[in-house]
Amino acid sequence: MAERANLFFHNKVIDGTAIKRIISRFIDHFGMAYTSHILDQVKTLGFHQATATSISLGIDDLLTIPSKGWLVQDAEQQSLILEKHHHYGNVHAIEKLRQSIEIWYATSEYLRQEMNPNFRMTEPFNPVHIMSFSGARGNASQVHQLVGMRGLMSDPQGQMIDLPIQSNLREGLSLTEYIISCYGARKGVVDTAVRTSDAGYLTRRLVEVVQHIVVRRTDCGTTRGISVSSRNGMIPERIFIQTLIGRVLADNIYMGLRCIATRNQDIGIGLVNRFITFRTQPISIRTPFTCRSTSWICRLCYGRSPTHGDLVELGEAVGIIAGQSIGEPGTQLTLRTFHTGGVFTGGTAEHVRAPSNGKIKFNKGLVHPTRTRHGHPAFLCSMDLYVTIESQDIIHNVTIPPKSFLLVQNDQYVESEQVIAEIRSGTYTLNFTERVRKHIYSDSEGEMHWSTDVYHASEFTYSNVHLLPKTSHLWILSGGSCRSSIVPFSLHKDQDQINVHSLSVERGYISNPSVNNDKVKHKFFSSYLSSKSKKKSRILDYSDLNRMICTGFIYPTILHENSDLLAKRRKNRFIIPFQSIQEKELMSHSDILIEIPINGIFRRNSIFAYFDDPQYRRKSSGITKYVAIGVHSIVKKEDLVEYRGVKEFQPKYQMKVDRFFFIPEEVYILPESSSLMVRNNSIIGVDTQITLNTKSRVGGLIRIERKKKKMELKIFSGDIHFPRATDKISRYSGILIPPGTVKTNSKESKKVKNWIYVQRITPTKKKSFVLVRPVLIYERGDGINLERLFPPDLLQEKENLKLRIVNYILYGNGKPIQGISNTSIQLVRTCLVLNWNQDKKSSSIEEARVYFVEVSINGLIRDFLRIHLGKSRISYISRKRNDPSGLGLISDNGPDRTNINPFYSIYSKTRIPQSLKQNQGTISISTLLNRNMECQSLIILSSSNCFRMDPSNGVKSYNVIKESTKRDPIIPIRNLLGPLGTALQIANFYSFYHLLTHNQISVIKYLKLDNLKLKQTSKVLKYYLMDENGRIVNHDPYSNNVLNPFKLNWYFLHHNYHHNYCEETFTIINLGQFICENVCMTKNGPRLKSGQVLIVHADSVILRLAKPYLATPGATVHGHYGEILYEGDTLVTFIYEKSRSGDITQGLPKVEQVLEVRSIDSISINLEKRVENWNECITRIVGIPWGFLIGAELTIVQSRISLVNKIQKVYRSQGVQIHNRHIEIIVRQITSKVLVSEDGMSNVFSPGELIGLLRAERAMRALEEAICYRTVFLGITRASLSTQSFISEASFQETARVLAKAALRGRIDWLKGLKENVVLGGMIPVGTGFKGLAHRSSQHKIIPFKTKKKNLFEGEMRDILFHHRELFDSCISKNFYNISEQSFIGFNDS
């Protein structure tokens, strides 16, 4: 018994771990028997005290934490600020989500930490406190839910629900919180049931793998070890101690020249403390990995037995102990999830706080600016950064580790405890994260713009997926798109005037043709379909683009204002009406469409005009088929070469098609929600109700196809035949049958008179039948003579220009054509190709310039198109901007950047009254704004889309017209329809006066109000429209621009005379500029909304509302620049790392994944950096002769270590301590097999055979030849099925297969393991049954190992490894593995 002087007197509360330590001390001091006596007394004392205290639990014992109120309030305040930043476009959705999760997680953690001190101060003998903090019942997180806050919950997939439960269970939950809480509770119940069985099965498999591992030797004689170093403080001291205690040293440990520990000495607590104090060299220890026994283990490699603290006894079944010690905690932990189920546990980053008030200084050269993952600006330091904080009397030095974010600027004043840096926490992120795609959807409809370049990958030239190279904003410029229920097309191009009867603003039908129909005979609109093609990406091919819809009920008129040829940006197309007087043929409903490039310059062989012949026009949908001549539809993407915006023909595609066929079918496109009154594959007659408000126009067979958000209903007219089974009609696509073919039916046979189209249809569960459909035949002619329409200039000297006619089919062979109700489909287009004789000598005449000449005779104005050949690179002098008479052209080097339009439409003053005379009908002017011809649609700017800013009063409501008392009386403006000469009036504007420009033209208007004729004067309002480059376009005093406040809703930044704009701020407002919300524009800083500047006046600014969305590099943008998006369309896709819930139910599958060696989906993010760090060391290693050998060995060792660390990490996160050696025994079994390669020694092992690693090495030594093999990780199930004992395998899985194979191969089972003996009823070779198998280890050492040849590797290799040992220790310990929680690194062979 020890002396009294060495005993300690403890006077403090002790928990479980402290008791463990005391017991181990007792055993050291007093031995086993006496210790058990002491512990018996402690147990009795505990029972007595518990009986005397008799803890009871009531609801009043749950004391809530007083500081909870303001903590939650603070978190809500932070969330609110975050929401604002997101709204202003400073952070994007992911950063917002991340930060809000961390805000609430931190709040919840603070509350949890407050709990213990709160109980201690207010009521130390509180039963809840006593039970949970002594560890007797419950743990901190459970009590935290009762008295703190329940916090963030995870759904059944382990994903986080970002709405926190702020109440605790004592206060009670609101309805929403209760529903969210049920998620977690259900998860708890399910996990308890399901995962417990999983944990049990895991235990069974683990025991199966290692059941034969028994301690059968004292020393295997290995010289290898694994080095553990506590240097640099990489490994936490606690883990370092756990790793070393109970192990055996593989090498002597020296302190200077003095040896402080010898080889094969086991390490106790005293020795570890000496290692820590002396900070010795890396300590080499023996582990099960290094044991040289093939199918068992030796005492020294295993180390101390955890039961009695001495070296493990011979014959102990350490394998089964290892399997159970890993499997059992899983079972326990899954049971525990029942209570805390679903509560989210994650990690937050560590912060560095300032030690005192003062000014902070650091080296600017070592940091570069970046964004944190919450979207805050910060500096990233790539190496250790030394920061000094100078207060009045003292200078503090703080070191910030590499890869951290510095959140303050140089020379900034910081306060004490202010967060100055955030350390990137590498520990928790690796284990519980996953890569997730997050789509951001548009909140409103409008036009998309972005403020940066985007990458177009070469293969995606035509697609709408773009990668962002840098952080930028996407803007959605608001505007209601007009989706008409009849024709979803844009009637006019960008920046047009709109005259009589365009689309009504509601999403309705095309408004009635004019009331005064006697004067206005017809109106013609030609347009291009907004193709929402079947491909999701909305990529248009040109055939869709060039297809025209000529509406059946709107005809061209020969009124002159209709042939004002206005220049359009992007694709300039002009309508020249056919005079029906000239052409008496079928040409009254058609027109020629001239397409002029943006810069007004034609190249040779380019398409000059289109004409759509009415005889090739169909009202219904259908399919085109050609006769089988090798023919191409000309309009393919790659066939049309765009040369500087000009479409050119390639002559090789001008082949003749004699005839083609059109198979008609009726197509109805219905919304997804519509209720059908007919069934699929049924036959209906004419005028059958299809839906509530649709009737069929033809009879026939119905086919219904459901697509995304819509249904397609097709009606095929024709006869139905039921063929015999032998009929070989193509199952999928139909076939054309020419006249005269005999069609055999089961009852009759008849000759086909016309062409028919036969299509086989197989309804589900019914007999298939054949549908015979009628076919329309079109013969191809040369089209009409378009050249007559463009007579050449008589004064021309040489006849140089030629116009050539080409016909082509607009649709591909067999391509379904979908028409829209009440519109016609053009099947063949006639094309006019411009050509001229190239002068062989001079290469400069390459291009023809086109412009319009307008001649006015007696008030009649005619437009002529003039084409002349010009030498390229000659710029013409432009006329002045306001000169109405001059005509000018611009040079071709930058047509898109200039603000003078080459086709400037000249309004002469005589025409305005004339047009007033001709159109005295009701007129509605609607707004069109579309800059993107590829995706046609219209946008109407209405009251919700623009706003006005008044510096004095801020934003006011527009519902009331306020009388304004300014110096000039305001003429009231009514929102009514008026004749063409006036602008559209503006309703609900209270102080609109300052929008009026200096030329105020008073117009007499007749307004019908309550059947009274009022004479009233109104002011004509004038607007400017800017183009993309910020230039003002279309500033003509008489034009009515497209931006009219129709339903009146834009936002005006109105200037009051009392407040002048700041000179500096005003100068920076440009047209087209994007302004974020809350930018200070005036001295008193009004609250702006975000938008694009449309109109700038001296005293007010009008913005078009726009919403910014932030996108960071690597995000994918969907859609094209200028495309019109609807609410709910996908804008951006982010890929980000999301942390998952860290409870054991997420952890157990991870353990299983590691042990079954399944591939992990995502590679760690830091992989590249790790490899970079390694490169330096690798070059030094590869330089030596045996580098490859070392590399192979290192790979095996390192992969084993990382497997151990991964498993440990999961258990440590749950507070479970498992000794490394248990995991090592299992990992050793997984990694101890190798696969013999093809080119190996085939006379010993067959290629593809699995053999033990040690066995392979022995075979090599015996044969003195190299065997090529690859290391494999087997996984515990496969390892169980590839042992040496077939009885053990058969009792695990696949009994019949294993036994049959063993019988065929004649396998012998030596009954070495435990399981085989249990199955056969023999004595198991462990414990007392082990004695007969004991080895004479002394004899093993005496016999010398003789070889015929001297092994060349032996001496040199030892020296190399010895020489480079320091190198390994340094480079591996620094760089190889994510060091945070690892226990040991590297290896050496001495």
Swiss-Prot record:
Q: Which residues cross the membrane?
A: none
Q: What Enzyme Commission number(s) appear in the record? A: 2.7.7.6
One GO CC annotation:
DNA-directed RNA polymerase complex
Localization terms from the record: Plastid, Chloroplast
Q: What does this protein do?
A: DNA-dependent RNA polymerase catalyzes the transcription of DNA into RNA using the four ribonucleoside triphosphates as substrates.
The main location class comes to: plastid
Record-linked NCBIfam families: rpoC2_cyan
GO:BP terms for this protein? DNA-templated transcription
Q: Please state what class of enzyme this protein is.
A: transferase
Keyword terms of this UniProt record: Chloroplast, DNA-directed RNA polymerase, Metal-binding, Nucleotidyltransferase, Plastid, Transcription, Transferase, Zinc
Q: What is this protein called?
A: DNA-directed RNA polymerase subunit beta''
Q: Quickly give the catalysed reaction.
A: RNA(n) + a ribonucleoside 5'-triphosphate = RNA(n+1) + diphosphate
The record's listing under Gene3D superfamilies reads: 1.10.132.30, 1.10.150.390, 1.10.1790.20, RNA polymerase Rpb1, domain 3
- List, in alphabetical order, the Gene Ontology terms for molecular function in this entry: DNA binding; DNA-directed RNA polymerase activity; zinc ion binding
Give the binding site residues for Zn(2+). Answer: C220, C291, C298, C301
Q: Which cofactor does it need?
A: Zn(2+)
Provide the family line: Belongs to the RNA polymerase beta' chain family. RpoC2 subfamily.
Instruction: Outline the subunit composition.
Output: In plastids the minimal PEP RNA polymerase catalytic core is composed of four subunits: alpha, beta, beta', and beta''. When a (nuclear-encoded) sigma factor is associated with the core the holoenzyme is formed, which can initiate transcription.
Q: Could you tell me what the cofactor note in this record states?
A: Binds 1 Zn(2+) ion per subunit.
Which InterPro entries does the protein's record reference?
A: DNA-dir_RpoC2_beta_pp, RNA_pol_beta''_euk, RNA_pol_Rpb1_3_sf, RNA_pol_Rpb1_4, RNA_pol_Rpb1_5, Rpb1_funnel_sf
Output the lineage of the source organism.
Answer: Eukaryota, Viridiplantae, Streptophyta, Embryophyta, Tracheophyta
